[in-house]
Structure formats: C-alpha cells, structure tokens
Amino acid sequence: QWKVVGLEQVLVGNGYAGKTDVIYIGQDEYGIIDFKTTKDAMKPFVPASYKMQIAMYHVAEHGGIDDKAAGYNIFISTEENIGSCRAVRYDAEELRKAWKAAQGLIAAWQYENDYYPNA
C-alpha cells in the first residue's frame, strides 16, 4: 500500500529542476511516478531520458538513491489503443545507473550554457 505525499511538485536539484507528477511512500519502497502520454502505450520502447528524469527527481527529493528507491513511468495511449495504460517500474539499481548518466548530461548542459548555479 502506498501513501501519496506529493502531487505536481516542483523539485530542485544541484543545477537542475523539474515538476514530478507523484511522490509516494510505500511499506517496501518509496519513489517517483511520472505520467507520459504517447501515441501507443503498448509499444515497449522507453527512452533512457525518462529513467534519468525519474532518477534526477529522486535525488532532488530524497538526496540520493538507496535500496528502497523505485520509480515508475505510466504511459497513456492517445492515438492507438486509446485509453490503454502501461506501467514501467525502475528499481534502485536502474535508477542509480540513470543518475550516473544524468550527471554527465547536467554537466554538459552547464558547460554548453556557461551556467553554474552552485559555483
């Protein structure tokens, strides 16, 4: 059973920010849920950037990614299989890998834009 502790919440990390759809706490895990509309939710492809986004939100909200961390993308079909939904879960190991990749993207974006908010 989960308890929702945040809806449409702005999260600010070290050099990045965004708005997540749901922050939840469960008995065995806690995490972030982000909804995505897509042409067909039943297609298996999930962009790596979606995992990185959830990892970034996790770090911004919780300060890190421990073994109880989890995240979900909920895909909602808008054209094919209209109204169908699919949930994709990311465990702590996947989120840690995604966070490592995201840190590189954050650094590259800051370099490209000469923007270092915490310098």
Residue ranges and their predicted role:
Residues E112-A119:
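Acidic, carboxylate-rich catalytic segments that either coordinate divalent cations
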